Amino acid sequence: MDRCALCPGKFNVVPPSGPEDSDVVFIGEAPGKDEDRQIIPFVGKTGRELNEHYLPLCGLRRDAVRIGNSIRCLPDRPQGRLDISRDKDRELLESCSAEPGGILAELEKARPRLIVPMGVLACYALDPDINLELQHGIPLETSWGTVFPMYHPAGGLHEPKKMLMIRNDWVRLGKYLKGKLKLSVDPYPDTDYREALPDELLEFPACNDYTFPLACDTESNRKREPFCLSYSFCPGTGRLIRAEDTETLSMFQAMLDHWEGPILFHNWMYDSHVVERMGLRFPHKRIVDTMVRAYHLGNLAQGLKALAYRLLGMRMSDFDDVVTPYSTPLCLSYLREAVNHEWPKPDEQTVRDPQGQWKLYKPQSMGTKLKRFLTDYSKHPDKDVFQAWDNWEDDHAQIEMVCGEWPGKSIEHVPMDKTIHYACRDADATLRLWPVLQGMTRQVRRKLSEHWED
């Protein structure tokens, strides 16, 4: 490859190693100093971890697989580790991986049976839609064929708490290669999510008892004011109560007062403040936090979406994915209305230049600044308008004083049918997670008991 303008201080190009016709190709992120010196990928400390510990876990030998990197030279890193959220690092990754001699060209030519990207950068180079937190250790069908995303082997060296998670993924890879990996499949593809009716809660005691687990979740607006409560006591179902529906909330409270089973929340520390502002009183001795349970197990993600996907096969939408499509047009409309307002011209000011001379300075009007903001956004429509607003150096207070409060991201902007599905699915997922986490906890306790008996 030619010397890259994005990385003028690069050293040696480190090509992949291993048989070119290998059925399995591993992709790392970028060479380190040891790799640059020996011109072989994964020969340093991380390489030893990979070759001596992880590859044997899945029954593979280093000389039997193809191993390369998304970025094929030691990049300049004045800011430290490469970060996909930085524009320059992302540009470097996209440019290097797409080079004629880069890793993507090699994959296009070889078309291996299985591709294993290791780390966020490698996953992004292969497919920006891969969500490593959700999908690590799970085979995916992509345009490249079957992909098995993994955390980078160095992850366990930098973050010891990740080591067990990484180890488990390599064991899963071995099972997959042998055809023995069992994947979670959502057993409830057809769900019943809707608003709760007062009659439903009135009839509840006649057809149910109060000893079953009850899962709850809350949603609030951007001011942290309560928006709704969702709950589920039967897998595949969920009900939503709006915060302003005091009649249904009072009936729900009557049901809570008699509840004898566990009441499940995922992150009770957050939800407790919301339910308190809704006027609901939950019996604290019944509360079980599934996020805390996942944390205590040690090798699991704590996010509800990641847990539900990995353990239950449930696909769930992130908050931003639900809210952004409806909040963005409102925010852009707000800015366009603000531009059309007749803003006063600011007074001229005298400022001292770098040479110490006093000069007359004419500040831009707020209208001009807003036009520049919108022009910049129109040139980069994929830009996050909310982040751009938060990062805007000018004072927001003047605009909000004239035009009203900035809409921002809020669940209030989402159509109610979408909100019902999103909120009820959270409660449903929490309910379904409970028996799985219970089983995993019992398994850990049994192993500990056997260990101490030995």
Residue ranges and their predicted role:
Residues 1-181:
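A polyanion-binding, active-site-adjacent surface
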Residues 31-32, 72, 155, 218-222, ...:
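Short, glycine/acidic-enriched loop or turn micro-motifs at the edges of active sites
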Residues 209-221:
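Two-metal-ion RNase H-like nuclease active-site motif
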Residues 25-27, 150, 214-217, 265, ...:
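Short hydrophobic beta-strand that contains or immediately precedes a catalytic carboxylate
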Residues 18-21, 222-227:
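Short, flexible loop/turn motifs enriched in small residues
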Residues 441-454:
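Acidic catalytic cores of enzymes that act on phosphate-bearing nucleotides/polynucleotides
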Residues 14-19, 195-212, 253-258:
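A short acidic-Thr-Gly-centered motif at the start of a beta-strand
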